[in-house]
Amino acid sequence: MTTRGFSVSHADGVPFERGLRSFFEYRDLGIKAATDGRVVAHVIRAAAGAGFSSRPHRHETSFQLVCVLQGWIEFEYEGQGVVRLLAGSCVHQPPGIRHRELGHSADVEMLEIVMPGDFLTEEVAAVDDDVRAAAVIRAPTD
């Protein structure tokens, strides 16, 4: 039996740090080190006092999953429109999909899992070529 790559991460004493987006803080879960960079997983939360600004962008990934643990966050996705995620909501963002964050609650926390562990983020001019064609998708409130 092998234990290579085994990883356990506990919340106690593990700091959140600023990362890709200045309005979020990230807590590394040790998965990137355990998988030799194939996968990164972190808990993301809103940074206290940070201003919010998100430009349309895309990521060069092979897999990206976001699950909201508490609070809410709203995204605009290419070809999908506006999507609000509440606690318990998950979204798979297909590779290269253009998107932007529109807003989030002060208490938002999310689990994000991305492959590969290091990926390129590229700003783009717009989320959709025709933003008027976008639909609105909202999570149920009941």
List the model feature ranges, each with a label.
Residues 25, 97, 106:
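Residues that flank catalytic or metal-binding motifs in active/ligand-binding sites
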Residues 15-57, 62, 142:
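A short glycine-rich, His/Asp/Glu-containing loop-to-beta-strand
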Residues 78-80, 103-104:
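Conserved catalytic-core motifs of eukaryotic protein kinase domains, centered on the activation segment
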